[in-house]
Each structure stands twice: as structure tokens, then as C-alpha cells.
């Protein structure tokens, strides 16, 4: 019995389909076999995890720094990155707050290669020590504890806070106090107190006095007999007073951290500078790209991912801040970009009040206000 042309076509189609299925199954089994043998089938670099190249320090010589995630252990990291737990212990000896592999905790930094030790993770509310946001790396890593010191009468605790009680000043348990430790006297010297007349005592918009003028004698500086009140927006940028002049106090530093969430939580701006009530500058958050921190510059950084990464303030989209923490100085907030009176939305209160938001009652700018620009300064006294 002969096959009709129709049946021949159908049989040929079935045969071709079986061949295609056979080829696909062969490829699948080959892929599984190579994956199980440790050879990556689809790796663009031709290497599997088991053949990972050794990690190396970055361009600045800092070790390859990894952020501990939930569930991480040194053993798991050693297996994942083809090193040993002994390597990890050795590479991290002397690192800030390193507890050893047995006590690593989520959020900490750990070296997974040789190289210089990294700066510790920034703590949003820290006011002393190396974990104050924006702190620069010292020349000597051993100087970390002395960075951002507290006033001479206070101790700096591992939490980044200043105080005089035992939980700030005692070195037991180990690590409670990191700098200027030991009992502190509560008696304050009258000579150490300074007073100024320029600090406003009301909650109205801030006004400041003009810069003191000098007399005809070059060796003395006298105050003007009549203070001329001006608004912050009328200040012209002028160089700060010469620090070598004995009759002028050193330039003070202001610093503020502005958060996207209440309670000083979430991503944040960190701004600091050296302006006083006479030398005023306008920081436009959406445009600012000045990130250099020094004894003379004004900087503004945007910290994301819980303070692990930073960029320029211009890289942030935050316009409705919910809380802030001011370390020192005072800031006036404007909705626009020109720091002008008609855009005024509020100003900060003293640093002693800690984290300030709508719940504490200390957040002067209303919750729905747009933070477009800042004008910050530290009050400075001029003595004769």
C-alpha cells in the first residue's frame, strides 16, 4: 500500500520536530552539566564564581570594602569571595569598632582585601568622633577618635554624642568613651563665658548687625556706636576677618543635617561652613555641587542608602524635609533659590534641642514648606 503525499508531509514534519526536541534536550543537559562542574555557561567574562579574581584595594589604596548584610558571616563571605576567615580577621585588625568575625553586625564595613582601613559608617546624629557625617579621613588612621572633639569639659562616647555622665566618660565597658575620657568637673569658670548682643531673642525673622568698623588707630578695633539692622538677603559676600588679628575671634563653624523623614531618619543633606552673621552665603540645594570639606569652604552633600553613599546636594530630589539636626550655628530656610525675604519659610532653633521636627515642636518651617535654599551662619563676637 503506497503512502499518499499528504501522509508523507505529515510524517516528515513529525520526524523534524523529534530531531529539534532531541537537540534542545541535548543543549539543556549540556548546560546543566557545565553549571554543576563550575564552568559558567552564560558568563560574559567566561569565569564562574569559583574562579573569581582576587579582590584588590581601590585607587586610593583603601581595601575592598563590603557592607555587612543580614545573614552574613565571615565564613559565608570567605566562601563567596574565595578568601579565608583568617584573611578577613587579618585584614580588619585595627579597623574602627572591629568586633571580630564572631560579632559582625549588619551595616558595618569589612575589608575583603588587603589595603588601608576604611572610614567607619557615618551616624546621622553623631556630633563627635569619626562617624559625624562628612568627616574627612585623617592622615593617621590612629587619630580617628580625636576627630570632631567635644568641648573640653565633655567626653565623646562611641555613640558619637558628648556628655559628662559615666555612660559618656567611663572607658568600662570597653569602648564607651573614645576621647577626652574620665570624670569631668561640673563647675564652670566665669571667665570662660562669652556673651553676644547679636543673637535675636524673638521668633521673628532673623536680622543681624553690620560688621564693626576700625578706628584710625591700626592696632585697635572698636564697635560702631549705632548698629545698622539689615536683612540676611542684603549681605554682600566679603572675606572673613584676618585670623591673625588678635582682637578678632576665630571663625566659628556651623553644621546642619536635613532629613527626608521625621525623627531624623532616612536619607539626608549634610551641610557645613564657616560663615558668621556678617558673611552670609546662599546655599541652593537643587543646584549646589560643592562637596569639598575644609577649614575655609562651605560644603553640601546628599547621603543616601542609610548614609552609606553620598553625592552632591544637586543630585537629590528632596524638597519637603521632615526633620533636621543642627550641630551648631543657625540656618534660615527659604522656598526659592535666592534666599530673599518673600520666600522665607522659617528658621532653626538651637543645637541643644537635638533632633527637631513637627512632633517636637521645634521645627519652625511648616511641614508642607519647600526647602529651596538655606542661609546658615555661626554667631561670632568681636572683642575690643
UniProtKB/Swiss-Prot annotation:
Q: Which InterPro entries match?
A: LysM12-like, LysM_dom, LysM_dom_sf
Cell location = Secreted
Q: Signal sequence span per UniProt?
A: 1-35
Phenotype of the disruptant?
Leads to enhanced fungal virulence, with faster decaying on infected fruits.
Q: Which cysteines are joined by disulfide bonds?
A: none
Identify the keywords attached in UniProt to this record, alphabetized: Chitin-binding, Secreted, Signal, Virulence
- Any Pfam family the entry gives: LysM14_C
Q: Does the keyword Zinc apply?
A: no
Q: Which GO terms describe its molecular function?
A: chitin binding
Domain spans labelled LysM: 64-112
The lineage's top-level taxon is: Eukaryota
Q: Which family does it belong to?
A: Belongs to the secreted LysM effector family.
Q: What does this protein do?
A: Secreted LysM effector that might have a role in sequestration of chitin oligosaccharides (breakdown products of fungal cell walls that are released during invasion and act as triggers of host immunity) to dampen host defense.
* Misc: In plants, chitin acts as a microbe-associated molecular pattern (MAMP) that is recognized by lysin motif (LysM)-containing plant cell surface-localized pattern recognition receptors (PRRs) that activate a plethora of downstream immune responses.
Q: What is known of its domains?
A: The LysM (lysin motif) domains are small globular domains involved in binding chitin in eukaryotes. LysM14 contains one LysM domain.
Q: What is this protein called?
A: Secreted LysM effector LysM14
Species of origin: Penicillium expansum (Blue mold rot fungus)
Amino acid at each position: 500500500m503506497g503512502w499518499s503525499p499528504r501522509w508523507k508531509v505529515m510524517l516528515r514534519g513529525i520526524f523534524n520536530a523529534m530531531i529539534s526536541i532531541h537537540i534542545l534536550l541535548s543543549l539543556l543537559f549540556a548546560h546543566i552539566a557545565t553549571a554543576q562542574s563550575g564552568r559558567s555557561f552564560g558568563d560574559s567574562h567566561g569565569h564562574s564564581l569559583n574562579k573569581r579574581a582576587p579582590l584588590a584595594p581601590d585607587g586610593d589604596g583603601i581595601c575592598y570594602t563590603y557592607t555587612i548584610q543580614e545573614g552574613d558571616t565571615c565564613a559565608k563571605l570567605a566562601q563567596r569571595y574565595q578568601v579565608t576567615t583568617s584573611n578577613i580577621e587579618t585584614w580588619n585588625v585595627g579597623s574602627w569598632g572591629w568586633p571580630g568575625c564572631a560579632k559582625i553586625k549588619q551595616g558595618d564595613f569589612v575589608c575583603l582585601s588587603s589595603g588601608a582601613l576604611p572610614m567607619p559608617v557615618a551616624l546621622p546624629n553623631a556630633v563627635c568622633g569619626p562617624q559625624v557625617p562628612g568627616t574627612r579621613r585623617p592622615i593617621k588612621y590612629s587619630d580617628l577618635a580625636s576627630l570632631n572633639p567635644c568641648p573640653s569639659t565633655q567626653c565623646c562616647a562611641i555613640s558619637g554624642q558628648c556628655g559628662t555622665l559615666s555612660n559618656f566618660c567611663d572607658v568600662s565597658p570597653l569602648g564607651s568613651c573614645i576621647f577626652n575620657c574620665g570624670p569631668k568637673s561640673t563647675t564652670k569658670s566665669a571667665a570662660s563665658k562669652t556673651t553676644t548682643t547679636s543673637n535675636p531673642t524673638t521668633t521673628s525673622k532673623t536680622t543681624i548687625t553690620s560688621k564693626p568698623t576700625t578706628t584710625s588707630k591700626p592696632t585697635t578695633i572698636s564697635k560702631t556706636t549705632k548698629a545698622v539692622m539689615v536683612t540676611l538677603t542684603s549681605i554682600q559676600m566679603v572675606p572673613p576677618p584676618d585670623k591673625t588679628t588678635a582682637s578678632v575671634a576665630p571663625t566659628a563653624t556651623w553644621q546642619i543635617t536635613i532629613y527626608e523623614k521625621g525623627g531624623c531618619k532616612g536619607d539626608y543633606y549634610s551641610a557645613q561652613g564657616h560663615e558668621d552673621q556678617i558673611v552670609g552665603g546662599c546655599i541652593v540645594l537643587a543646584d549646589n555641587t560643592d562637596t569639598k570639606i575644609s577649614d575655609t569652604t562651605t560644603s553640601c552633600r546628599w547621603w543616601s542608602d542609610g548614609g552609606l553613599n553620598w553625592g552632591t546636594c544637586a543630585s537629590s530630589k528632596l524638597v519637603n524635609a521632615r526633620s533636621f539636626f543642627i550641630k551648631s550655628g543657625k540656618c534660615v530656610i527659604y522656598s526659592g533659590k535666592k534666599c530673599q525675604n518673600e520666600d522665607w519659610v522659617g528658621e532653626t532653633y538651637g543645637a541643644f534641642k537635638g533632633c527637631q521636627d513637627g512632633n517636637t515642636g521645634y521645627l519652625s518651617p511648616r511641614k508642607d514648606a519647600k526647602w529651596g535654599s538655606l542661609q546658615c551662619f555661626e554667631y561670632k563676637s568681636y572683642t575690643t
